[in-house]
């Protein structure tokens, strides 16, 4: 008769099961354990959702910066307005302010600098009185990328109380990356007309424009814009030097600045920009508009002789 070797194995398994702890097989429902596990799942889902929102903010911020850099072009101006609304909604969250609270906490957390940078820039769209002080701390960190993100946030926020000196240090720091310095110069221009301390910004523009003319054209262009916004013809001679700069954007901003300053003594510099030597249409148009401002809205088109007669008649 054949033996059945499975019998002792089955008996051994049965014995092992019978001798095990009965609690492990009872299937007793533990509501507290389920609550803990559900809490873990909810927390993980919330973290994933917030991370997705951060990524959306980051992409929107990049698009916003691109749109701002192309200001004056209709489709980019429209895009900027749309992105502004989107980012304000994302930063606020649902319920209102809930995402802002998370961003404030994240802005001071250096454990993940990528997320921290997004928070510092995005808080520029926050509707909270304490946002400026939070972003300002980021602008004084040692990490250049975080500083650049924070400067962007301060520019967007446009809080009149923002200390210009923090951003000015970035502009004037030649060891800082060039793109960051240009961004900081743009930020100062953006803050200038709304600032309670605009007098602290003027020396920055003078330092740039009285320095090396071979500096990055965008740095010079922002300095010219800023000096133009002072609407003070006292520094018009400094601006006039840049009407012959090799970069069209610099020449254009020099012309616009002279118009805003109502720099009557510099009309000859503007007339030169109307002549055959100037081949960039936008520069010629800027010079023409500046001459109109100097002449009390009189327009002589692109006729240099008529413009010269207009200004000589007024003497």
Predicted features along the sequence, with ranges:
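Bacterial N-terminal signal peptides
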Residues: 8-15
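Structural detector for internal amphipathic alpha-helices that build alpha-solenoid repeat scaffolds
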Residues: 50-55, 72-95, 114-128, 137, ...
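Amphipathic, non-transmembrane alpha-helical stretches in extra-cytosolic proteins
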Residues: 30-73, 77-82, 307
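Terminal, low-structured helical/coil segments at or just beyond the last alpha-helical repeat
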Residues: 289-315
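Bacterial Sec signal peptide processing site at the extreme N-terminus
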Residues: 17-34
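Short inter-helical turns and helix N-cap capping residues of alpha-solenoid HEAT/ARM repeat scaffolds
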Residues: 111-112, 142-143, 175-177, 212-216, ...
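Amphipathic alpha-helical scaffolding segments comprising HEAT/armadillo-like alpha-solenoid repeats
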Residues: 57-70, 93-108, 128-140, 148, ...
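Bacterial N-terminal signal peptides that target proteins for export
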Residues: 1-7
């Amino acid at each position: 008769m054949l033996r059945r070797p499975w019998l002792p194995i089955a008996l051994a398994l049965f014995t092992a099961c019978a001798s095990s702890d009965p609690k492990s097989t009872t299937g007793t429902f533990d509501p507290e354990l389920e609550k803990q596990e559900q809490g873990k799942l909810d927390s993980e889902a919330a973290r994933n959702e917030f991370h997705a929102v951060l990524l959306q903010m980051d992409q929107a911020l990049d698009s916003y910066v691109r749109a701002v850099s192309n200001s004056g072009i209709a489709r980019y101006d429209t895009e900027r307005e749309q992105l502004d609304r989107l980012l304000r909604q994302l930063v606020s969250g649902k319920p209102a302010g809930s995402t802002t609270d998370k961003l404030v906490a994240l802005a001071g957390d250096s454990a993940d600098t990528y997320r921290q940078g997004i928070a510092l820039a995005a808080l520029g769209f926050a509707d909270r009185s304490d946002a400026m002080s939070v972003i300002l701390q980021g602008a004084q960190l040692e990490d250049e990328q975080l500083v650049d993100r924070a400067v962007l946030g301060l520019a967007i926020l446009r809080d009149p109380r923002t200390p210009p000196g923090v951003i000015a240090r970035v502009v004037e720091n030649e060891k800082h990356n060039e793109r960051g310095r240009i961004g900081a110069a743009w930020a100062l221009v953006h803050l200038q007309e709304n600032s309670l301390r605009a007098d602290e910004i003027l020396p920055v523009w003078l330092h740039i424009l009285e320095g090396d003319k071979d500096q990055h054209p965008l740095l010079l262009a922002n300095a010219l814009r800023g000096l133009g916004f002072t609407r003070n013809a006292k520094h018009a001679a400094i601006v006039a030097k840049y009407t012959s700069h090799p970069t069209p954007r610099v020449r254009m901003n020099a012309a616009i600045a002279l118009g805003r300053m109502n720099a009557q003594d510099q009309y000859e510099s503007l007339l030169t920009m109307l002549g055959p030597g100037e081949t960039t249409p936008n520069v010629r148009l800027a010079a023409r508009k500046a001459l109109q401002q100097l002449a009390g809205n009189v327009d002589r088109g692109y006729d240099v002789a008529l413009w010269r007669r207009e200004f000589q008649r007024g003497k």
